[in-house]
Amino acid sequence: MSAVPGPVYGLEVPPGEILIPAAMEFPASSLSVAGASFATPLVLPAGDLNSNQKILQFRITMAAVDPTEEPEADGEGNIPTVPRSTLRLVKRALPGLEDEDDEIDDEYMKALLAGSDDEEDSDEEANGGPSDPAKAKKQRQAAAIKKLLESAQEESDEEMEDAKPNGKAKGKAKATEESDDDEDEDSDDDSEEGADLENFVICTLDTERNYQQPLDITVNHGEKVFFVVTGSHTIYLTGNYIMDDDEDDEDSEDEDEYDLSPDELEYGLEGDDSDASDDLDGLEDPRVEEIDTDEEEAPKLVAANKGKNKRAAEEAAGLDELITKEDAKLSKKQQKKLKNNKGEAVAAEEKKDAKKVQFAKNLEQGPTGSTTEKPKQAKDSKPATGVKVVQGVTVDDRTVGNGRTVKSGDTVGVRYIGKLQNGKQFDANKKGKPFSFKAGKGQVIKGWDIGVIGMAIGGERRLTIPAHLAYGSRGLPGIPANSTLIFDVKLLEIK
């Protein structure tokens, strides 16, 4: 799975305490519940997605007001001397909870927003009264949303009193209106549910000096997030959808070699395309003999490297090995190699895979060149690995690649595994389309912009990135604030 930038995201948040859902699953109309208005964002056209893509999240990068727009008066009909608007974000305190009892299901959320439950539906429910624990919990959640909105308003107590439910969201609000005594009894529960909601001020914009504000807010698909604006002007949010591209690039030999185990690679080469398959049908025995030869020579190369460089044999763990260790489909023969040769067996297998790909490619050209070039390349290759600190990022070269190196402005494609210092993995790109970005241009965290400079194709690095060069004090889902991050990165291509 790999994340790629998608179409432009846009959302209009009008003033007047209107609660705007940022997600994409809600009905395409402006609705209201518990005295608070709701509206939906722009719906992504189906034509913008291909069959292999789905929305993972969206990233909001700009908030702006139109200074030429006529300001809206407040509830008393007054227009401030300096028109301004404040943007707030309302969200669940713990997004993505797995416990079904602690989250509002999608059907209920739609019903809550649409307010379309009629009295007949309410009468048909088996346990339709406040005594039903599930329904009472949902009523408390609706009341908590209402209370949060009322606390954000700067209107009088009488105006807030007018904002009580008035027949909207009938199926869920009707039981709340039945008895004021019931509301008093559940006040403690309402406060407890209200603790699940958080209200954050994002920015305040005016029409004289601060027309716009750059942001960097990423909202996961399905996360319950809303925006509210108080003031005189509409605030416009823009950004990009982030898509999941599961399309496998069958034409890339490097990707196939990287993703598959030796047995899977051999099978894939036999059936990858019709022309190659036809050529290999008559050469099955020589092909098997060549693979056996590689397996016999590989331990010799490992032994030679082990004698020259103990550090590479004892502690260097390449990205290929990390991915292989996580693969539950390893054969017994591969597991035996990993056990006897520690990390080096993986390097030997990688060279064997490369040999097989090269051999299959050269079958069409004839039996010249391939058998003599590979040992020479292995003999001349002398990786200069080591640990150094570059602008605060600790760079540990595990494998040095070949060819030209990455410079600022190059577009690169990489595989990576990201972990916290306690070893917990929070992100990875191990198969499918490589993760691509432009180095040194701010498209990724600062530590990556620094850490990939100087890598060559095929090279592997471990980047230890301090918090101030990663996500700082804000953190992300799965990444606590002020976390030092460790990335194992392999460079596949430079464009």
Swiss-Prot record:
One CC-aspect GO term: nucleolus
Main location: nucleus
Pfam families named in the record: FKBP_C, NPL
Keyword check for Signal: no
InterPro entries per the UniProt record, alphabetical: NPL, PPIase_dom_sf, PPIase_FKBP_dom, PPIase_Fpr3/Fpr4-like
Alphabetical UniProt keywords: Chaperone, Isomerase, Nucleus, Rotamase
Residue ranges occupied by any PPIase FKBP-type domain in the UniProt entry: 409-495
Summary of activators and inhibitors of this protein: Inhibited by both FK506 and rapamycin.
Extent of Basic and acidic residues compositional bias: 373-382
Region (Disordered): 115-198, 243-312, 333-385
Compartment(s) where it occurs, according to its Swiss-Prot or TrEMBL record: Nucleus
Gene Ontology molecular function: peptidyl-prolyl cis-trans isomerase activity
Keyword check for Flavoprotein: no
Comp. bias (Acidic residues): 116-126, 152-161, 178-196, 243-283
Catalytic reaction annotation: [protein]-peptidylproline (omega=180) = [protein]-peptidylproline (omega=0)
Subunit structure as annotated in this protein's UniProt entry: Binds to histones H3 and H4.
Protein family (similarity comment): Belongs to the FKBP-type PPIase family. FKBP3/4 subfamily.
Protein's job: PPIase that acts as a histone chaperone. Histone proline isomerase that increases the rate of cis-trans isomerization at prolines on the histone H3 N-terminal tail. Proline isomerization influences H3 methylation thereby regulating gene expression.
Protein name as it appears in the record: FK506-binding protein 4
Gene: FPR4
